[in-house]
Amino acid sequence: MSATRLDVPVVRLPHGMDLPLPEYATAASAGMDLVAAVPAEVPLVIAPGAWALVPTGLALELPEGMEAQVRPRSGLALKFGVTVLNAPGTIDADYRGEVGVILINHGREPFTVSRGMRIAQMVIAGVQQITLVETGNLGETARGVGGFGSTGLDRTP
């Protein structure tokens, strides 16, 4: 199945001019890698348990009805314990500032973010706005009010 591609205007900010634009790694990739626009001579070090806002050097003009989700890269999480703190971070269609990534280091060692390092994924998705309608009751379901583990952990018979 071939999806229709949208053109999304992007601005490279002065501190990101030499960095590659995000792109899909494979034909079936859902996300595009975002890279760090930290100064080459001053890498960003995130101590264990600390977090930092990492610049990307990019600003987007998303179409109305779309959002960009900033998600972790699984390799950083598995190898270093580094992930996106507010995953998924949301970039609204009316935001025009720099895309930033809040990384947190859950690892045991300091983590160094260097210029051009792939730090997160950006997934573009549609948004459906709703209107909440206050009511006195909700329709019944098999699950009911069960939540937070109410369906169990073990799926073996």
Curated annotation (Swiss-Prot):
Q: What is its EC number?
A: 3.6.1.23
Q: Which cofactor does it need?
A: Mg(2+)
InterPro entries reported in the protein's UniProt record: dUTPase, dUTPase-like, dUTPase-like_sf, dUTPase_trimeric
Look up keyword Metal-binding and say if it applies. Answer: yes
Sites binding substrate sit at 73-75, 86, 90-92
Under PANTHER family, the record lists: DEOXYURIDINE 5'-TRIPHOSPHATE NUCLEOTIDOHYDROLASE
Q: What protein does this entry describe?
A: Deoxyuridine 5'-triphosphate nucleotidohydrolase
